């Protein structure tokens, strides 16, 4: 099964990715992991990526796509994979189609975990972190026993500056605008499957499981 996982920040992609790879024994391939592995192994594309990163420059698409090609050609991807964080643009998605064709494979599903942006705002702005021990809480989903005080060490809880409402709202807005063309692209190809991410996390996985179970 060859899958792509999509969803806005706070949609719960990480949790679902863990459950998918654990049950179906396929590699979870994130963009960051791909780059780190390629640079560590000093592959041709990894060395090219390193030269851009060391200069503080953006890695061009052709290098990123080359790294994806290298990674998907590896033996652990024979039974399938879960791509996370790639593609980000329609140009990258088109290049991925070519890679899959060259490998004699196809993308089975693009799973988009759908959550209303108002709920995402609540999820993302409710996070609180202990100044002393780093324990994480959520005002609604995992509140401390006593307001603004860490249950574990009694330290003061704070909200990270990038978790404030304005910053989060802007981040979501940018993500929505960036992902829409990609979702439209995959919808036209018939790959796109929308998953209700507003349910309990186990129900979200149950819905994914029903959908992809036939591919195993």
From Swiss-Prot:
Segments for region (LID): 126-163
Gene3D superfamilies: P-loop containing nucleotide triphosphate hydrolases (3.40.50.300)
Binding site for Zn(2+): 130, 133, 150, 153
Enzyme class: transferase
Entries under InterPro entries matching the protein: Adenyl_kin_sub, Adenylat/UMP-CMP_kin, Adenylat_kinase_CS, Adenylate_kinase_lid-dom, P-loop_NTPase
Example GO biological process: AMP salvage
Subunit structure: Monomer.
Name of protein: Adenylate kinase
Organism: Bacillus cereus (strain G9842)
High-level lineage: Bacteria, Bacillati, Bacillota, Bacilli, Bacillales
